[in-house]
């Protein structure tokens, strides 16, 4: 299932069993999303255009599992992160967390996730890897 942003806080408790299983995982595979004008969070209806612009203004560069973070890999406080209904971000310090992401729009988000230790493995293409190493 796709991660989502709940319309209210009570919706977060709907899948406690699944969230508990996710917390116990020793390996996680995640995608890294960007926050460009046609970001999947917006296109898929999880955030409004106004929320996307507010996230961008707050310095957000990417998201994983719906959790929005800035260029330092820090979660953006408040805003849509208070409504995320997906599993918490896995800890790259205690489990293998592999991100799959590519493309120039995602370089800032991938860099932030790797630098902060949100992920400790990456599947990407050669062009994106070169941009990350530049």
Label each PLM-derived region with a short phrase.
Residues 1-134:
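Conserved phosphate- and dinucleotide-binding cores of soluble alpha/beta proteins
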């Amino acid at each position: 299932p796709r991660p989502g942003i709940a319309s209210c806080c009570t919706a977060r408790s709907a899948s406690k069993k699944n969230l508990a299983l996710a917390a116990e995982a020793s390996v996680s595979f995640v995608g890294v999303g960007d926050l460009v004008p046609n970001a999947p969070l917006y296109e898929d209806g999880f955030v409004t255009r106004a929320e996307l612009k507010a996230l961008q203004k707050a310095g957000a560069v990417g998201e994983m599992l719906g959790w929005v973070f800035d260029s330092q890999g820090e979660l953006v406080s408040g805003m849509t992160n208070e409504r995320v209904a997906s599993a918490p971000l896995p800890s790259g310090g205690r489990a293998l967390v592999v991100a799959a992401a590519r493309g120039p729009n995602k370089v800032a988000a991938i860099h932030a996730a790797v630098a902060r230790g949100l992920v400790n493995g990456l599947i990407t293409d050669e062009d994106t890897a070169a941009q990350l190493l530049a």
